[in-house]
Amino acid sequence: GSFLEFLPIIPYLVASTSPAFHVIVPSLPGYTFSSPPSVDKDFSRYDVARLINKLMVGLGFGNGYAAQGGDIGSDVARILGARYDTVKIVHLNFCGGKGPDIEFTEAEKPGVKRMGWFLNEDYAYVLEHRHRSSTISIVLASNPVALLAWVGEKFLSWSDVSPSLDTILESVTLWWVTETFPRSIYPYRKLDSSHGGPIHMDPNLHLNVPLGFSNFAKEIIPMPERWVASTGNLVLYRHHEHGGHFAALEVPEVLAKDIADFVKLAWR
């Protein structure tokens, strides 16, 4: 992912007057035009959160701000909400991990099936990024067609409606010309949290601040409401039949409305 995926949602957020937003869309360290972390030391999502909070305070939001994220950004947003008093509320559209054992409702079963498909058939890239980071980085940095194949297939299989070829090429070209794909997968090396499991299931990162969640049917890991509620102070949960992993790109107006409604409800 990159900031390109968030550009379509910005006009909807900026146009909101109740509430009104200052929208900050930072690139994570090492992504596209953002400076990389040092290669001689580990750099985790906890470090990313620390730098993002430092950025927000430096921009004048030391009295409080809202954090929002999907995919890796959702991990960073959770860490921010759990560890930094400057973060007043958190909205997510991804919450990877397995929650407590529950009996799924009929409405939840398609999402569980989708989750099973992803974990059984489409999860191999995570293991490659995590355990063979340098190997896959060398391969994808050596050939733009290889990078297109690796990234492009995710756009196709993780979206509700496939993005246009131009949209896919824009993202892949950005990775290629900035030569940043290898360092962008650094976070996978420290994929688990301190408790040995997914960030979102870490009891030490349970969110006491208000949590909002947007669930999209074609997300790679759709999350039942009760699972999300087990990870924090859930005050707003919305399920959408249309939309997938790249919600800000696919259905920006829908996600923007969820964010605005949540902020209006939870911000104090």
Residue ranges and their predicted role:
Residues 168-169, 202:
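Transmembrane alpha-helices and adjacent helix-loop boundaries
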Residues 175:
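Acidic, glycine-rich loop-and-strand cores that form catalytic or ligand-binding grooves
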